């Protein structure tokens, strides 16, 4: 298994699919990385040379991924909560943020049902 950006990349999958195992790299970004390095997107990771894997590592390093990206997302959410805006309040209360209904749905965000006290 190759290791790129601190993530074990599966050997037996195509390069584009394998790169999506990195947090912050989707299909489009993976295709751009392959195009920039000149690596065949349909080639499997185990068939790549060490030099090609190093090129992939270099390109992935340019993209904001893994811990840095997670930290950035958390900081943006924390900023909304500190501002006290509507989205921040919804985050703070653990409710849906993007306008979804909550009367009947939103169980994932609200958590399990609480029994009604009499």
Curated annotation (Swiss-Prot):
Pfam families: Ribosomal_S13. GO terms for cellular component: cytosol; small ribosomal subunit. Keywords: Ribonucleoprotein, Ribosomal protein, RNA-binding, rRNA-binding, tRNA-binding. It comes from the Bacteria. GO terms for biological process: translation. GO terms for molecular function: rRNA binding; structural constituent of ribosome; tRNA binding. Residues 93-118 are annotated as: Disordered. PANTHER family: 30S RIBOSOMAL PROTEIN S13/40S RIBOSOMAL PROTEIN S18, SMALL RIBOSOMAL SUBUNIT PROTEIN US13M. Belongs to the universal ribosomal protein uS13 family. Part of the 30S ribosomal subunit. Forms a loose heterodimer with protein S19. Forms two bridges to the 50S subunit in the 70S ribosome. Located at the top of the head of the 30S subunit, it contacts several helices of the 16S rRNA. In the 70S ribosome it contacts the 23S rRNA (bridge B1a) and protein L5 of the 50S subunit (bridge B1b), connecting the 2 subunits; these bridges are implicated in subunit movement. Contacts the tRNAs in the A and P-sites. This is Small ribosomal subunit protein uS13. The gene is rpsM.
């Amino acid at each position: 298994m190759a290791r790129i950006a601190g993530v074990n990349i599966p050997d037996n999958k195509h390069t584009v699919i394998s790169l999506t195992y990195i947090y912050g790299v989707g299909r489009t970004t993976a295709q751009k990385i392959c195009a920039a390095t000149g690596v065949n997107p349909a080639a499997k990771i185990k068939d790549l040379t060490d030099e090609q894997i190093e090129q992939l590592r270099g390109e992935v390093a340019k993209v904001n991924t893994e811990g840095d990206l997670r930290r950035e997302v958390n900081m943006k959410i924390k900023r909304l909560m500190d501002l006290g805006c509507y989205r921040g309040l919804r985050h703070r209360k653990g409710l849906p943020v993007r306008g979804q209904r909550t009367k009947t749905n939103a169980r994932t965000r609200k958590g399990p049902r609480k029994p009604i006290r009499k």
